[in-house]
């Protein structure tokens, strides 16, 4: 079978080595004669899987000991509710930075629980979409917390600045599409959350990193399944967790450590992004509408000079083993999601195809 590269924004490509190991262990996990999907989440065998996954995740991100790591249900959208329900306390106002589609979605959900002060950070620089620097974000004195999304998968916009608003500002962030792709200073955040289906593992699992002093503040209306304190006190097993997704995430964490950790992935991700953006920028046939300072290294949207060729581009790229390149319906065009599991060879294959397509149709 010819090599296939999956550029889907999520569920996304998983490391081939992880899939092969999961395949080998699927029906007989560690000699038990059963699948890891079938064993009790409270049995010693799965407890070991869970503990190792958390230890490896902590090591990869250098998570301090005063932070809890929760393995949850609900996805990023679940945390759009989970953040205000857990962090708002007796306050009513929270700051929300709007820099794209997912940040706006978080605002919409938050309105059910609080009064969001929406900081519109979207600007235009030399005709391209960009984001205001953090120094220009007008925060509300005494707000319960600040929420933002460091990487917008649909818009292809990234905010790579490290928050530095002082100890009085609780920073919460949706890292779903950029977690583990670059090093971050966890100490600068009160809560970090990430859906697993992009850089962690399969869909169905959500990771939350929460500072311990923020526990115990949940609203009385907060469902127990979203209550960080309940989840922490029950080691993320208040109810049956998504065990197979948890197991696969653990395999991905071990794979990442074998690759050299997050610092090594950061360098590889930079190489992949530079290669793809280089082809786009040096072409009169393709274009990207995001200012260079805010370009995402994970999600690269691009347009063809003639949109009438979009259908042909997608058909030919799919036939060439380059799958899921269709852009989101909101922005159209193409989008290549190049998360950690996408090898450099996959991006090279894509850029070779793009250059050939341009020669034939430009």
UniProtKB/Swiss-Prot annotation:
Catalytic activity: O-phospho-L-serine + 2-oxoglutarate = 3-phosphooxypyruvate + L-glutamate; 4-(phosphooxy)-L-threonine + 2-oxoglutarate = (R)-3-hydroxy-2-oxo-4-phosphooxybutanoate + L-glutamate
One of the GO BP terms on file: L-serine biosynthetic process
Annotated pathway: Amino-acid biosynthesis; L-serine biosynthesis; L-serine from 3-phospho-D-glycerate: step 2/3; Cofactor biosynthesis; pyridoxine 5'-phosphate biosynthesis; pyridoxine 5'-phosphate from D-erythrose 4-phosphate: step 3/5
EC number per UniProt: 2.6.1.52
Pfam families: Aminotran_5
Keywords: Amino-acid biosynthesis, Aminotransferase, Cytoplasm, Pyridoxal phosphate, Pyridoxine biosynthesis, Serine biosynthesis, Transferase
Residues carrying N6-(pyridoxal phosphate)lysine: 198
InterPro entries reported in the protein's UniProt record: Aminotrans_V_dom (IPR000192), Aminotrans_V_PyrdxlP_BS (IPR020578), Pser_aminoTfrase (IPR022278), PyrdxlP-dep_Trfase (IPR015424), PyrdxlP-dep_Trfase_major (IPR015421), PyrdxlP-dep_Trfase_small (IPR015422)
A GO molecular function held by the record: pyridoxal phosphate binding
SUPFAM superfamilies assigned: PLP-dependent transferases
Cofactor annotation comment: Binds 1 pyridoxal phosphate per subunit.
Domain of life: Bacteria
Sites where the protein binds L-glutamate: 9, 42
Positions that bind pyridoxal 5'-phosphate: 76-77, 102, 153, 174, 197, 239-240
PANTHER family in UniProt: PHOSPHOSERINE AMINOTRANSFERASE (PTHR43247:SF1)
Family stated for the protein in its record: Belongs to the class-V pyridoxal-phosphate-dependent aminotransferase family. SerC subfamily.
Full protein name: Phosphoserine aminotransferase
Species this protein is from: Klebsiella pneumoniae subsp. pneumoniae (strain ATCC 700721 / MGH 78578)
């Amino acid at each position: 079978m010819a090599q296939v590269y999956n550029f889907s924004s999520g569920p996304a490509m998983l490391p081939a080595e992880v899939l092969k190991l999961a395949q080998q262990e699927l029906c007989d996990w560690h000699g038990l004669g059963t699948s890891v999907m079938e064993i009790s989440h409270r049995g010693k065998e799965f407890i070991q899987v869970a503990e190792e996954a958390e230890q490896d995740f902590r090591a990869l991100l250098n998570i301090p000991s005063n932070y809890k790591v929760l393995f949850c249900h609900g996805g990023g959208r679940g945390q759009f509710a989970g953040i205000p329900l857990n962090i708002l306390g007796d306050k009513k106002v929270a700051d929300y930075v709007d820099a794209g589609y997912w940040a706006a979605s978080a605002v919409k959900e938050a309105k059910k629980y609080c009064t969001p002060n929406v900081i519109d950070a979207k600007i235009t620089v030399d005709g391209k979409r960009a984001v205001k620097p953090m120094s220009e974000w007008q925060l509300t004195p005494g707000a319960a917390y600040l929420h933002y999304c460091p990487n917008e998968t649909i818009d292809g916009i990234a905010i790579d600045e490290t928050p530095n608003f002082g100890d009085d500002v609780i920073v919460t962030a949706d890292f779903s599409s950029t977690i583990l792709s670059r090093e971050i200073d966890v100490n600068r955040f009160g809560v970090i959350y990430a859906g697993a289906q992009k850089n962690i593992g399969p869909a169905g699992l959500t990771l939350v990193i929460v500072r311990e002093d923020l526990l115990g503040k949940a609203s009385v209306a907060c469902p127990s399944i979203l209550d960080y304190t309940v989840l922490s006190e029950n080691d993320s097993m208040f109810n049956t967790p998504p065990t197979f997704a948890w197991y696969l995430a653990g395999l991905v964490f071990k794979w990442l450590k074998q690759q050299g950790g997050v610092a090594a992935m950061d360098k590889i991700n930079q190489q992949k992004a530079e290669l793809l953006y280089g082809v786009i920028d040096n072409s009169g046939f393709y274009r990207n509408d995001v200012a260079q300072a805010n370009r995402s290294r994970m999600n690269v949207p691009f347009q063809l000079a003639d949109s009438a060729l979009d259908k042909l581009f997608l058909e030919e790229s799919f036939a060439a083993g380059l799958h899921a390149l269709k852009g989101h319906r909101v922005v159209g065009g193409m989008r290549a999601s190049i998360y950690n599991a996408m090898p450099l060879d996959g991006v090279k294959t894509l850029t070779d195809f793009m250059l050939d397509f341009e020669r034939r149709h430009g």
